[in-house]
Every structure is written in structure tokens, then in C-alpha cells.
């Protein structure tokens, strides 16, 4: 299966910013992203390498099921979320703020 660049640019939705993701970034050189529900690990790896220009060591994914929430008498449901924990090769560093600034200039 060939991966086209248009698909790769859509795979990563948004970086996850939380206490856990910050600790992983500092101690384990891992970045956390929300990704498309049907994204595969090879696609995620290729997308990170293409968009941020870093080498990826491994990708771990987890799908979090959406919670059921009540709005008065109406039952609603939050969407399922797929997260990817991307481990970078030693010596590689990913600065999301610099990457976002560079993307804004284009």
C-alpha cells in the first residue's frame, strides 16, 4: 500500500498537551498526538517524519472509548479518540512551537 502525501498530512490531528504528555516528552523523548481513528502505525510514523523532519524509533497507539454523557434527559456520547505515542530516535528532538511557527509563515 503506497502512502500518498495528502493522506499523511491529514493523519495527525493535534498534539496532546497534558501533564502526562509533557513528562513523556522530557523523560522518554516521546511525543503524543491525536490521530485519525483509521490511521495505521506505519502511516503515523511516516507522517511525523514528513511533517517534522525527525526520525521515529517506534509508535504505540491507544484508542480511548468516548464516555456517555447526559444533557438533561438526553443521553449523548463523546467521540472515541485514538492517540499515538511516538518515540523518537536518541539525539532527535521535536519542538512543536517552532514547527507551528514555521507552518504559520508558509
UniProtKB/Swiss-Prot annotation:
List GO terms (cellular component aspect): ribonucleoprotein complex; ribosome
Q: Which UniProt keywords apply?
A: Ribonucleoprotein, Ribosomal protein, RNA-binding, rRNA-binding
Kindly give the Gene3D superfamilies that the UniProt entry links to this protein.
3.30.70.330
Q: Which GO terms describe its molecular function?
A: rRNA binding; structural constituent of ribosome
Q: Which SUPFAM superfamilies match?
A: Ribosomal proteins S24e, L23 and L15e
> One GO BP annotation here?
translation
A Pfam family this protein belongs to? Ribosomal_L23
Superkingdom of this entry's organism? Bacteria
- Give the similarity note: Belongs to the universal ribosomal protein uL23 family.
Function statement: One of the early assembly proteins it binds 23S rRNA. One of the proteins that surrounds the polypeptide exit tunnel on the outside of the ribosome. Forms the main docking site for trigger factor binding to the ribosome.
Q: Which HAMAP family does the record cross-reference, listed alphabetically?
A: Ribosomal_uL23_B
Binding partners and assembly: Part of the 50S ribosomal subunit. Contacts protein L29, and trigger factor when it is bound to the ribosome.
The name on file for this protein is Large ribosomal subunit protein uL23
Task: Give the organism the record lists.
Answer: Neisseria gonorrhoeae (strain ATCC 700825 / FA 1090)
Report the gene name.
rplW
Amino acid at each position: 500500500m503506497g502512502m500518498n502525501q495528502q493522506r499523511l498530512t491529514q493523519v495527525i490531528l493535534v498534539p496532546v498537551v497534558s501533564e502526562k504528555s509533557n513528562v513523556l516528552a522530557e523523560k522518554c523523548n516521546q511525543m503524543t498526538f491525536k490521530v485519525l481513528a483509521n490511521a495505521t502505525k506505519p502511516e503515523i510514523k511516516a507522517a511525523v517524519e514528513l511533517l517534522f523532519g525527525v526520525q521515529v524509533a517506534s509508535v504505540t497507539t491507544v484508542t480511548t472509548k468516548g464516555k456517555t454523557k447526559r444533557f438533561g434527559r438526553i443521553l449523548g456520547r463523546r467521540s472515541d479518540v485514538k492517540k499515538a505515542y511516538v518515540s523518537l530516535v536518541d539525539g532527535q528532538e521535536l519542538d512543536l512551537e517552532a514547527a507551528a511557527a514555521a507552518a504559520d509563515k508558509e
